[in-house]
């Protein structure tokens, strides 16, 4: 918006004339200063106002300029008002209005203004160099570290040793649709946007910290939800000898050896269930030991849980008395995908030295190396008595020579759903050597009614005698672990351990006598 043009004529109003004189006098002196600096010349201004008051301006010294003026005798340019008006008329101005300044003159600035603008420009350049590189483009790609369970089973926060082997794969999400900050609301299921979205709840967290199944883990992106849970589209499972078998979410579920829970609707969420009982078996383990009072919750009906978020349960019956500080969620959800004991037999987590090999307990498919499983002493249990290796009975000629087996105590009350002995700390001994059957011995009824459970009878497992009826033929031996269970009460994930008919007349003395007679070669 330019200045208001006024007519160039004498101002009649005294006040306006004084104001105009003051402003334009300073403007004239400013132009003289700029001209003297830019063009390296000497300028002298002598002004007398209407009241004959003198105002002068000199670029250097007025006397020196006036001396030069008086002594100068060469032809020179001399202009008056008439000359200026004539020049303006030639340029197109009528001489009545105040002409617009020339283009070059309008762009000229004083040295002070030039310095100020130069400093401002330098400051802006510094700001752009400092902060300009961090401004993201509209479509940018930001690498995000997402835990992906790709090589082994899932990762759990375990203060005293993890049951499963953690394996994280760093993936880079470069889709601008997922990480673009221009979108105010990101998808909560951004890792698998093609699947239906469901809100995450606390049921999806196993033990409060399921890092690889939930996107609630810390993410480098500060713009909201990156992944509410891991993509249920792909989940690596171990099936037989294949460690990297990937099952798509839309494929049929792998066959299981036990009765599966009825699923009313198919959902694309995967669940890794290693402890499966037809009657809704739940295993509750504390941080340091097995809480026997929690055994009352074994018969909780699965219909009482209505959570729809994916759950991963890794509670195995062979590790109940180990005192491992992990907790398991009740397997009360849709059983679209369940891992059988044969599929879990080759997982590296179940064959680690810190835990009992599930493949040796359930399927007995592959010979395992002799392991040294930890045998902590849970409450109300005694360590197994040392065994004396003796020659094996000749009824089993097809069995190869056995190496030294290592015994792992297993709580009987947690292995039997619906068992009338939830509080009895009787322990079975499970060998981790292949081709060895398990001989289970339930406790006598007198121990159930005792206020304080006595020390349980722990005996080494060996091949039962032909005449002994303590091993159930319906359960099958461990050499045929792939065979379906004849009874619906127990699944093969329980290690095919089942109680035999309770002997009424046998006491602890008879059991301890068998400790010396039952031998293992």
From Swiss-Prot:
Modified residues (N6-acetyllysine): 245, 439
Effect caused by changing residue 291 to N: Abolishes transcriptional activity
Database matches in InterPro entries: HJURP_C (IPR022102), MEF2-like_N (IPR033896), TF_MADSbox (IPR002100), TF_MADSbox_sf (IPR036879)
DNA-binding region positions on the chain: 58-86
Residue numbers spanned by region Disordered: 174-207, 244-266, 357-407, 437-521
Posttranslational modification: Phosphorylated on Ser-444 by CDK5 is required for Lys-439 sumoylation and inhibits transcriptional activity. In neurons, enhanced CDK5 activity induced by neurotoxins promotes caspase 3-mediated cleavage leading to neuron apoptosis. Phosphorylation on Ser-180 can be enhanced by EGF. Phosphorylated and activated by CaMK4. Acetylated on Lys-439 by CREBBP. Acetylated by EP300. Deacetylated by SIRT1 and HDAC3.
GO-annotated cellular components: chromatin; intracellular membrane-bounded organelle; nucleoplasm; nucleus
Residues modified to Phosphoserine: 98, 106, 110, 121, 180, 190, 231, 251, 444
UniProt keyword terms in alphabetical order: Acetylation, Activator, Apoptosis, Developmental protein, Differentiation, DNA-binding, Isopeptide bond, Neurogenesis, Nucleus, Phosphoprotein, Transcription, Transcription regulation, Ubl conjugation
Biased composition regions of type Pro residues, renumbered to the chain: 373-400
GO molecular function, one term: histone deacetylase binding
UniProt effect for mutating residue 439 to R: Abolishes sumoylation and acetylation
Keyword Ribonucleoprotein: no
Effect of residue 444 to A: Abolishes K-439 sumoylation. Reduced neurotoxin-induced apoptosis of neuronal cells. More resistant to degradation
Region of interest (Beta domain), ranges: 286-292
UniProt-reported outcome of changing residue 438 to A: Abolishes K-439 sumoylation
Cross-link type Glycyl lysine isopeptide (Lys-Gly) (interchain with G-Cter in SUMO), residue numbers: 439
Pfam families given in the database record: HJURP_C, SRF-TF
Main location: nucleus
Record bears the keyword Ribosomal protein: no
Stated consequence of mutating residue 437 to A: No effect on MAPK7- or EGF-mediated transcriptional activity
Protein family per UniProt: Belongs to the MEF2 family.
Comment field on protein domains: The beta domain, missing in a number of isoforms, is required for enhancement of transcriptional activity.
Quaternary state and interactors: Interacts with MYOG. Forms a complex with class II HDACs in undifferentiating cells. On myogenic differentiation, HDACs are released into the cytoplasm allowing MEF2s to interact with other proteins for activation. Interacts with HDAC4 (in undifferentiating cells); the interaction translocates MEF2D to nuclear dots. Forms a heterodimer with MEF2A. Interacts with MAPK7; the interaction phosphorylates but does not activate MEF2D. Interacts with CCAR2 and HDAC3.
Name by which UniProt lists this protein: Myocyte-specific enhancer factor 2D
Species of origin: Homo sapiens
Gene designation: MEF2D
């Amino acid at each position: 918006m330019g200045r208001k043009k006024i007519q160039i004529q004498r101002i009649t109003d005294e006040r306006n004339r004084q104001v105009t004189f003051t402003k334009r006098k300073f403007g004239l002196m400013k132009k003289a200063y700029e001209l003297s600096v830019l063009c390296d010349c000497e300028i002298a201004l002598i002004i007398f106002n209407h009241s004959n008051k003198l105002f002068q301006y000199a670029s250097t010294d007025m006397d020196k300029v006036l001396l030069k003026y008086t002594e100068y005798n060469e032809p020179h340019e001399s202009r008056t008002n008439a000359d200026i008006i004539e020049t303006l008329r030639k340029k197109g101005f009528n001489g009545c209005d105040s002409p617009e300044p020339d283009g070059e003159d309008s762009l000229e600035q004083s040295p002070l203004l030039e310095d100020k603008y130069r400093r401002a420009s330098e400051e802006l350049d510094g700001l752009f160099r400092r902060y300009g590189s961090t401004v993201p483009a509209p479509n940018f790609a930001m690498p995000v570290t997402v835990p992906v369970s790709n090589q082994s089973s899932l990762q759990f926060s375990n203060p005293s040793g993890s049951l499963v082997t953690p394996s994280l794969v760093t993936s880079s999400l470069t889709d601008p649709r997922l990480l673009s900050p221009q979108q105010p609301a990101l998808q909560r299921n951004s890792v698998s946007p093609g699947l239906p979205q469901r809100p995450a709840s606390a049921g999806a967290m196993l033990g409060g910290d399921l890092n690889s199944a939930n996107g609630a883990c810390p993410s480098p992106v500060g713009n909201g939800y990156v992944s509410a849970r891991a993509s249920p589209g792909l989940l690596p499972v171990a099936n037989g000898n294949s460690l990297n078998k990937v099952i798509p979410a839309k494929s049929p579920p792998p066959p299981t050896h036990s009765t599966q829970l009825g699923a009313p609707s198919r959902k694309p969420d995967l669940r890794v269930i290693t402890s499966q009982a037809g009657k809704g078996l739940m295993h509750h383990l504390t941080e340091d030991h097995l809480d026997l009072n929690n055994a009352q919750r074994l018969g909780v009906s699965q219909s009482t849980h209505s959570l729809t978020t994916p759950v991963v349960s890794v509670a195995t019956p062979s590790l109940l008395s180990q005192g491992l500080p992990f907790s398991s969620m009740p397997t009360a959800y849709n059983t679209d995908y369940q891992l059988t004991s044969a599929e879990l037999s080759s997982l590296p987590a179940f064959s680690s030295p810190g835990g009992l090999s599930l493949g040796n307990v359930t399927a007995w498919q592959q010979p395992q190396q002799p392991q040294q499983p930890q045998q902590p002493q849970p409450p109300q249990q005694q360590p197994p008595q040392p065994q004396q290796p003796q020659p094996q009975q000749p009824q089993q000629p097809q069995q190869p020579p056995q190496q030294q087996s290592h015994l792992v105590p297993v709580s009987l009350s947690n292995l039997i759903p619906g068992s009338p002995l939830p509080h009895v700390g009787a322990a079975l001994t499970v060998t981790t050597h292949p081709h060895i059957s398990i001989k289970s011995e339930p406790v006598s009824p007198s121990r159930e009614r005792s206020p304080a459970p006595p020390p349980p009878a722990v005996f080494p497992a060996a091949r039962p005698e032909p005449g002994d009826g303590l091993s159930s033929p319906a359960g099958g031996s461990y050499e045929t672990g792939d065979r379906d269970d004849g009874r619906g009460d127990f699944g093969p994930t329980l290690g095919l351990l089942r109680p035999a008919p309770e002997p009424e007349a046998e006491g602890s003395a008879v059991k301890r006598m068998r400790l010396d007679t039952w031998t293992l070669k």
